[in-house]
């Protein structure tokens, strides 16, 4: 193949990647067709089956276990499917084991047809070529925010957003007490954070205080020498040798109280060291009506279910259903990754439900934020938004279909006597609900569209499109200006130019030329690493939140033959701000001037000479050329 000639001023450091690889790789990892059924990773369709099965009957007499699945190749090729007006699908067969008392019945059950992706990253549904648009949505994880109270004070809060399940919000009130809201609709149902922490594992005041602050055991003599005496508070009530109460719990020490301890011959006392203005959790404990875990559970149940009589067992079940049941609450791998990253935790990514450490560390971070009036999170930043590709979108729908099937299987199990003969998996499983959900997704979902076939560019753009609309996303009526606007974190990830004019402006966008999606769904863009002032050809892909901490030079910065910057100062970016900086500070460099824009925009000649509005029209109109 003859070598392509380049008339540009800059050499290409990195080849343009496979532009439809996003679609193909996503669906490949969803189906895992090339992997042996016994060696498949716990992802995609395999993960959904592992989540739902094994299923146990109510009387524990029958257990239905999932073993593996296979997908047969399509009976007709793509061209014949289009010609005959049928779907390009493969038959999904699943191996199940049914255990009835001591007997085991093995059977392969057909769950219907599942659409297969063509080599072009499309699907053939009823003879028509369709594309599934990737969805840009708010990432699971934790988000710190601030709102201004009517009195003018700034109230800090955080939200823990799961992939599936109830949101949780924790917020300071006007009196500097920390309250937790478990119900977004009924915000009056709030209770102190200490009540919730006590209910989920921090049973005593000492447990809570030692996790949030530093506890020291000190003698009265040591206290008299302490410089910051007012920073010490009692953890528990202090009694004299004859049992008389000397100092109540949570009391701030002063010289008179230390003298009282010394005169009463108290040898040592446990104290919590809290610097001035950081006693928010201590104040919550002092105001907390619940003093034991049982009290805390009853208090939570009383607030959440005001009409029901509170009981400890019911409260435990309610909390388990809301936050500690894998089937109802799932942070997802992404949610756990974001929590670990934001709070400095080291919990495994498989730990996908909330842990008491998550809440304690988040509350500590919130108190620190309140103290230093720190920077809250930007919800429009691409560190807080991720892409759901075709595989993940279909996986979520398959999960819904299988949970419906699960309900039907359990009902059938309860109607069948375990002593009956001839019970097989086929008699228990009705695949209609599962097939129906998949058909509905491809035929009616907002993100499933007829492929734009006007020209090759329109086809390619259609497959690289990102939409903030669709189920679980925004609606065009409620989306404000901020979410539609170009953000500094879009650099090299989302094209700032190519977007529709009209009501969808900013909500539908296109991936930049070199952008790729990482394992967690975050957009990454490539940069050349700068080592000891020399620009190397080593390429690092960075996400938006990682990129912010580096000084990054533009692709057109002049270099000598060895890769050193010629000019003493270089136009570069740091934390989203562009400025001239000394060349010694530069850590990365853009790979190409094209990396900012999408495929369609990159085809506009002399793009920098265009007005942004005209470039937008040009990028869109190229797709209409016949």
Predicted region positions:
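N-terminal non-catalytic structural scaffold regions of very large proteins
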Residues: 1-467, 473, 512-626
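Structural and coupling elements of P-loop NTPases
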Residues: 82, 501-504
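Flexible, glycine/threonine-enriched loop-and-boundary segments that flank and lead into catalytic domains
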Residues: 105, 465-496
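Short coil/turn connectors at secondary-structure junctions
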Residues: 120, 128, 491-492, 503
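Conserved helicase core region in the C-terminal RecA-like lobe
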Residues: 494-501, 508
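Extended hydrophobic-aromatic, low-complexity segments
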Residues: 505-507, 519
């Amino acid at each position: 193949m003859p070598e392509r000639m380049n008339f540009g001023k800059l050499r290409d450091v990195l080849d343009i990647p496979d532009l439809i690889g996003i679609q193909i790789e996503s669906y490949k990892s969803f189906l895992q067709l090339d992997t042996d059924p016994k060696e498949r990773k716990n992802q995609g369709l395999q993960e959904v089956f592992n989540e739902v099965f094994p299923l146990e009957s109510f009387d524990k007499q029958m257990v239905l276990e999932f073993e593996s699945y296979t997908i047969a190749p399509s009976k007709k090729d793509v061209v014949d499917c289009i010609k005959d007006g049928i779907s390009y699908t493969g038959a999904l067969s699943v191996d199940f084991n049914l255990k009835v008392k001591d007997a085991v019945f093995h059977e392969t059950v057909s769950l219907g047809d599942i659409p297969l992706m063509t080599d072009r990253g499309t699907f053939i549904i009823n003879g028509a070529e369709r594309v599934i648009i990737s969805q840009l949505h708010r990432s699971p994880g934790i988000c710190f925010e601030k709102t201004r109270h009517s009195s003018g004070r700034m109230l800090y809060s955080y939200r823990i957003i799961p992939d599936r399940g109830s949101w949780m919000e924790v917020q300071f009130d006007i009196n500097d007490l920390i309250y937790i809201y478990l119900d977004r609709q009924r915000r009056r149902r709030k209770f102190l954070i200490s009540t919730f922490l006590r209910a989920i594992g921090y049973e005593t005041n000492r447990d809570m205080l030692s996790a949030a602050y530093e506890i020291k055991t000190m003698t009265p003599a040591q206290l008299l020498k302490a410089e910051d005496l007012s920073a010490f508070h009692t953890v528990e009530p202090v009694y004299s040798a004859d049992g008389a109460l000397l100092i109540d719990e949570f009391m701030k020490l002063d010289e008179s109280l230390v003298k009282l301890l010394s005169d009463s011959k108290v040898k040592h006392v446990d104290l919590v060291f809290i610097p001035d203005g950081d006693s928010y959790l201590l104040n919550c404990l002092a105001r907390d009506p619940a003093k034991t875990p049982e009290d805390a559970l009853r208090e939570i149940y009383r607030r959440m279910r005001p009409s029901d009589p509170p009981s400890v067992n019911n409260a435990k079940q309610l909390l388990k259903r809301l936050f500690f049941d894998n089937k109802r609450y799932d942070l997802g791998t992404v949610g756990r990754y974001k929590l670990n990253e934001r709070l400095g935790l080291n919990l495994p990514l498989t730990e996908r439900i909330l842990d008491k450490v998550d809440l304690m560390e988040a509350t500590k971070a919130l108190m620190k934020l309140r103290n230093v009036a720190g920077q809250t999170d930007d919800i429009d930043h691409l560190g807080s938004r991720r892409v759901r590709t075709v595989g993940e979108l279909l996986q979520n729908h398959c999960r819904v279909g299988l949970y419906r099937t699960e309900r039907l299987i359990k009902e059938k199990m309860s109607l069948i006597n375990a002593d009956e003969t001839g019970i097989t998996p086929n008699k228990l499983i009705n695949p209609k609900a599962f097939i129906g959900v998949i058909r509905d997704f491809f035929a009616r979902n907002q993100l499933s569209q007829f492929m734009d076939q006007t020209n090759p560019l329109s086809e390619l753009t259609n497959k690289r499109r990102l939409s903030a609309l669709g189920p679980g996303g925004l609606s065009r009526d409620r989306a404000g200006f901020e979410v539609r606007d170009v953000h500094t974190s879009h650099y090299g990830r989302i094209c700032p130019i190519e977007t529709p004019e009209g009501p969808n402006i900013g909500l539908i966008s296109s991936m930049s030329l070199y952008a790729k999606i990482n394992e967690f769904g975050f957009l990454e863009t490539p940069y050349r690493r700068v080592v000891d002032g020399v620009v190397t050809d080593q390429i690092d892909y960075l996400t938006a939140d990682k990129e912010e901490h580096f000084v990054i030079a533009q692709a057109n910065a002049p270099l000598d033959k060895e890769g050193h910057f010629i000019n003493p100062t270089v136009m570069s970016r740091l934390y989203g701000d562009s400025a001239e900086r000394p060349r010694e500070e530069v850590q990365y460099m853009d790979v190409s001037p094209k990396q900012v824009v999408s495929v369609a925009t990159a085809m506009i000649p002399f793009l920098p000479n265009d007005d942004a509005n005209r470039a937008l029209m040009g990028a869109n109109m190229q797709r209409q050329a016949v």
